[in-house]
């Protein structure tokens, strides 16, 4: 759908990239093949198991299907993977490596082992409602799906008459070196300031460019 909406691309195939994030990767394939090995023996495990379960299989498959011969990369950073992929894709364009990048995230974690793991860590909402920004939030609801955007260098998009839906001004990420899932108490302001500093820098550069 992203390619269809974008229309005819003019960028060289070597300057077209793919950046797709996933939190887990091919966990369904892994569980399936573990059961096969347990029930039927090691020789029945699929030779395609490894390439099917690798997190970077998604961008690789997309690049092969559409002939994108630039970077085909993956971020595997849990729930932030798709957003990180968008930020990294935007950097590929901002730094002059790519003119076009398909970017986003994909996840399909509906297997018994994943469900059991999230259940036992009490990560699921007890009321069955996912509301991450609500003060009364109590967990998430597992789902599967994908979201992909086509990012393009601004001048190239304007020149070919593309319908521009949004502009990414910048992005930043930090680690609070505290806990694998829980945020560090009292440090959110410092981490937010990193993004704000980057955003201000990008805005200044845009204003200078327009003068």
What is the role of each PLM region?
Residues 1-16, 193, 197:
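Conserved active-site "lid/cap" helical segment
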Residues 22-25, 77-81, 105-110, 170-175:
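Acidic, glycine-rich active-site loops and adjacent beta-strand->loop/helix elements
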Residues 29-32, 111-117, 178-181:
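Short acidic, glycine/serine/threonine-rich loops at helix termini
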Residues 194-211:
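Positively charged, low-complexity/disordered segments
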Residues 15-19, 99-103, 165:
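Short glycine-aspartate micro-motif
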Residues 2, 18, 23-27:
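A short acidic, glycine/proline-enriched capping/turn motif at secondary-structure boundaries
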Residues 128-189, 193:
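Condensing-enzyme catalytic core mediating Claisen C-C bond formation in acyl metabolism
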Residues 15, 25-88, 97, 117-142, ...:
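Conserved catalytic cysteine-centered active-site region
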């Amino acid at each position: 759908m992203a390619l269809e909406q974008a229309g005819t691309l003019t960028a060289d195939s070597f300057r077209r990239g793919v950046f797709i994030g996933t939190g887990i990767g091919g966990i369904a394939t892994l569980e399936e093949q573990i059961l096969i090995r347990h029930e039927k023996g090691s020789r029945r495990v699929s030779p395609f198991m490894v390439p099917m379960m690798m997190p970077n299989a998604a961008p690789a498959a997309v690049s092969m299907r559409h002939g994108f011969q630039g970077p085909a990369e993956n971020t595997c950073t849990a729930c932030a993977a798709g957003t990180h992929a968008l930020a990294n894709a935007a950097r590929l364009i901002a730094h002059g490596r790519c003119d076009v990048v398909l970017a986003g995230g994909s996840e399909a974690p509906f297997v018994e082992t994943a469900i059991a793991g999230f259940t036992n860590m009490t990560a699921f909402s007890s009321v069955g409602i996912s509301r991450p920004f609500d003060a009364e939030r109590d967990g998430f609801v597992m789902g599967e799906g994908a979201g992909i955007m086509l990012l393009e260098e601004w001048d190239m998009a304007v020149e070919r008459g593309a319908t521009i839906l949004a502009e990414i001004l910048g992005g930043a990420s930090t680690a609070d070196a505290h806990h694998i899932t829980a945020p560090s108490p009292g440090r959110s302001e410092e981490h937010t300031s990193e993004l704000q500093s980057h955003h201000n820098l990008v805005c200044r550069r845009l204003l200078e460019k327009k003068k």
